[in-house]
Amino acid sequence: MATQPPQDQTSTTPSLPPHLDPTTYPRILTSATHNIHLELTYSTLNPTVALEHTSSPAAGANVLFLGTTRDTFEGRAVSQLSYTSYPPLALKSLMSIATRAVEKFDLKGVYIAHRLGVVPISEASIVVAVSAGHRGMAWKAAEEVLEEVKEKVEIWKREEFVDGGMEWRENRERDAEGRILSSTEGGK
């Protein structure tokens, strides 16, 4: 009777579902009609690329927002953040937000990229860039886009603390000034 060769340990390891496998990223969705570029990625975010996507000869204003990982949360030392998502839903939600913003604020371009996986202290987890004919519309649009992304998009955050603790959080638990929102004011 022949003996079976030992199995390679890697072949018995269950594979990750595609939406959790970093090798299947970046996931990108675009709209040439509205100059929209949306991206979910495990790579470091590049604000220069964001501005390249949104710049337009018709734009007199470009607004760029970078959300970065802080080193503390409510007095606890943070070691890093981790993000996860379900890309088909997240990209659909991002496109809806970006398209509404283009129409509402007459934007010339929108770029939204969100990082997934581990995001160390001081690194960006989200970049939002918009361009418009004038600065007032660009400022308002960028803030509204960011708030809607945090409130509506299927992306979840795990805060990992230096003391070894960790907590999963919705992106939308605080307002733009850092105040805690009640469950009736916002959130998923």
From Swiss-Prot:
Endpoints of the signal sequence: none
Comp. bias regions, Low complexity: 1-14
Residues annotated to bind substrate: 134-135, 150, 157-159
GO terms, molecular function: molybdopterin synthase activity
UniProt KW keywords: Cytoplasm, Molybdenum cofactor biosynthesis, Transferase
Biological pathway: Cofactor biosynthesis; molybdopterin biosynthesis
Chain residue ranges for the region called Disordered: 1-23
Subcellular location per the Swiss-Prot or TrEMBL entry: Cytoplasm
Gene3D superfamilies the UniProt entry points to: Molybdopterin biosynthesis MoaE subunit (3.90.1170.40)
Catalysis: reaction(s): 2 [molybdopterin-synthase sulfur-carrier protein]-C-terminal-Gly-aminoethanethioate + cyclic pyranopterin phosphate + H2O = molybdopterin + 2 [molybdopterin-synthase sulfur-carrier protein]-C-terminal Gly-Gly + 2 H(+)
EC numbers, comma separated: 2.8.1.12
Main location: cytoplasm
GO BP term, pick one: Mo-molybdopterin cofactor biosynthetic process
Pfam families: MoaE
GO cellular component: cytosol; molybdopterin synthase complex
Enzyme class name: transferase
UniProt-listed PANTHER family: MOLYBDOPTERIN SYNTHASE RELATED
Subunit structure, as described in the record: Heterotetramer; composed of 2 small (MOCS2A) and 2 large (MOCS2B) subunits.
Function in brief: Catalytic subunit of the molybdopterin synthase complex, a complex that catalyzes the conversion of precursor Z into molybdopterin. Acts by mediating the incorporation of 2 sulfur atoms from thiocarboxylated MOCS2A into precursor Z to generate a dithiolene group.
Protein name, as recorded: Molybdopterin synthase catalytic subunit
Organism expressing this protein natively: Aspergillus fumigatus (strain ATCC MYA-4609 / CBS 101355 / FGSC A1100 / Af293)
